[in-house]
Amino acid sequence: MEEFVIPVYSEDEIPYALLSRYPLAIQTNVKIEDVEGKHNVVKIPESDMIDIPKLTIVEAMNYKPARNDGIVVPRLLDITLRAYDDRKSTKSARGIEFMTNARWMKWAIDDRMDIQPLKVTLDHYCSVNHQLFNCVVKANAANADTIYYDYFPLEDYKKRCNHTNLDLLRSLTNMELFHALQGAAYSIKSSYELVAYSERGSLEETYVVGQPKWIHLTRGTRIGNSGLSYERFISSMVQVSVNGKIPDEIANEIAQLNRIRAEWITATYDRGRIRALELCSILSTIGRKMLNTHEEPKDEMDLSTRFQFKLDEKFNRADSEHVNIFGVRGPATDEGRFYALIAIAATDTQKGRVWRTNPYPCLRGALVAAECELGDVYSTLRRVYTWSLRPEYGQHERQLENNKYVFNRINLFDSNLAVGDQIIHWRYEVKASAETTYDSGYMCRHEAEEDELLCKINEDKYKEMLDRMIQGGWDQERFKLHNILTDPNLLTIDFEKDAYLNSRSELVLPDYFDKWISSPMFNARLRITKGEIGTSKKDDPWNNRAVRGYIKPLAESLDFVLGPYYDLRLLFFDETLSLKQEQSAVFQYLSQLDDFPALTQLRGDAVCPHSGGALYTFRKVALFLIGNYEKLSPDLHEGMEHQRYVHPSTGGTYQKRVLEMKDSCQLTCFVIDYIFEKREQLRDTKEARYIVYLIQSLTGTQRLSVLRSTFPNFFQRLLMLKEIKFVRDLNVINFLPLMFLVHDNISYWHRQWSIPMVLFDDTIKLIPVEVGAYANRFGFKSFMNFTRFHPGELKKKQIAEDIHKEFGVVAFEYYTNTKISQGNVHTPVMTTKMDVLRVHLSSLCAGLADSVVYTLPVAHPKKCIVLIIVGDDKLEPHTRSEQIVSRYNYSRKHICGIVSVTIGQNSQLRVHTSGIVKHRVCDKFILKHKCKVILVRMPGYVFGNDELMTKLLNV
């Protein structure tokens, strides 16, 4: 067969029953009307396309596809063709057989993050319908296995858009590098009502029981978020009672709980009225609404099930604690008992006290719901219901029941606090770059100003850890940096728990309040102090809410490594699906930075989020990282000892290569190539990603084999760790986290595992760095700060001490044999967001172009494929062809022809062919009906059968 026929028809003119024998057909009478010349992407959720939800972009990035009629990996054919080409012949008892590189093929498929969850329909003729905005493409089921959608956000010439390599944009969102950063803050809990019942004139004055005193306030004054009452409260000049209050955000959910409670009370506490699944669902909703930190969603299924069992247990009238709770009289009420039982069930599920920072929505929601009725939950449980935490949950937390915790961490991106409202917030200052020499290097100096507190390594605790390390090697689960720091400890400070009302209802603030805490090892000083809301909440995250607060794009905040002291927010906002919407003001801000034109080749205020924002951010990160590692090189700088330089800095001869980078794995490989292999060429993106995958997934001799073959000079340096001779031999340790921790589609097995890194302090130390505990993600931040420190030439040449030799052996064993990444990625969420980003970007630029791609196999005289592309008229046919072919990274040589069909809103048909393919558009008459057909011809070539693609996909 040399011809392939594609009918182009309208059901108004000819029924599909007459055309269903054709493998492919295009129906033009079903379309979605354009609005102002653009595709109405708002209609995607109600159309049979792919599953993109009608949510905000922040919610959509965490959305798990609901309707899934099957998934398609757009580049699967590209991958299998490469695997087919690379098969090796082997001899077996059955003769010559061909073996596929299964490891590579599995990686290439798993590495893809553009999976499409399809929403397609099957008609009565067993055809699979793929809906486009201007038509419907019908394919016989036998031919549908390789069809995929291709969405392209059109480029706005005013912004000088360049929408190639949108994979980089997806990578940056995964690694929390396409975000704004804003300081953490605290306010009085919205579920509390604080009522004054006595006042004093000074902190030295004590409150007299039963003799209330009033100076500026009056009895019953409610403490708000501003004004005199707040000032008196925050100054600890007033005693308050803590009552529950229902925040507006969760009023509906609390009403549902109270309805269940009323039925339960009316039915004389019948457990049958308590449906644990329903209760848990409502509490989870409350927990999600009252989230104060923004991070990836938790899979709470197992814990939720345990919580439901505990709810059933506690509402059983035969349960001993149920009996005790109902045996208490006095101020106890049935309304309170309902929430007391919920709180006890949550505590038993957690096996300890539940705080607002609990990561599980159902438990966090249980606490918040109980607060609305009981005020401070654990104080009320002890005081009113005579219930305390079980001894096995820890004596320390039992002591906290005497206190009331009235402050709650708030996320300033989300908070509805009004202008003028008072807050407590963190100020975070990073040490500026400094001038030094190659002889001096850049060491960590633990110094503080006279009025500053200092957070550094506690020498005694460090020595204890060192002894354990020498005895038993590196203990990644128990070695913690926070365990060896002095107080105030920046890794354990939690103002929400450190500030409280004591048993006399006096506000107690921590000793570190309103004082600068300096920590040179984190290159920062921090201070928690009083603040004020300066701007109202906006949808745009680029909005500095606090007076004297801070907000930074990630390109300017690589040194902000202490994650608990700030919040992050994606730089996209508003609806995922929109015809046209405003983009964040952050991109205009970036365009004003001095190095923006050099890193993007763009000028002016109109900036594309990708070609301006994403490219600038990635390149700035790359320059910063390479600049740190270049100075950390173990090589000596003979004759340059007194040469001066500024560190850290982002200048260097490697900037040209950075401008060519397309992927974070290229950056990882380039650092090793440039510094150790003296190679300035970039590796191909696919090669770099596979190298990093192998290093992260293999262990032992297999990992070493990859390093030996890929980075031979680096490998020799790595072997030196087993026999350290000079201090400079330790430098290689701090290169290893770059290879093991950084990727855009991995998950750590446990983000609180600690890896060994060298801290070039007054004395060189091997310290534990938790892989994801400070910044919560799979990128550079957990370790980047420690790469800035490097010894000078004088220090490098020193003979290594015995303890340094221990460092080398321990680090070599750990990094050779440990898998840090390759944990469980939430695949349905992580891998399906490429098209979400494309469609959202289209609303910020010039709209969307859509198409589907169909693959036609050719069997003779050579095996190859022809791509049939059916799309709209937003792109020229030859332009669309070039774009789609460019995505076949591995198997482009097998594409021998292209048919590009465009259908306009008015059903106008255009066809473009190239390669071995020729075409002709004809009229076809069947009985009294008429349609157009595209005759696709390949002179001298023969099409393959339907199952040729099946065989290829099972190579």
UniProtKB/Swiss-Prot annotation:
Subcellular location: Virion
Highest rank taxon of the organism: Viruses
Gene Ontology MF term list: structural molecule activity
GO annotations of cellular component type: viral inner capsid
Major place of residence: virion
Protein's UniProt keywords contain Transferase: no
Xref: Pfam families: Orbi_VP2
Family as reported in the entry's similarity comment: Belongs to the orbivirus VP2 family.
Protein name: Outer capsid protein VP2
Name of the coding gene: Segment-2
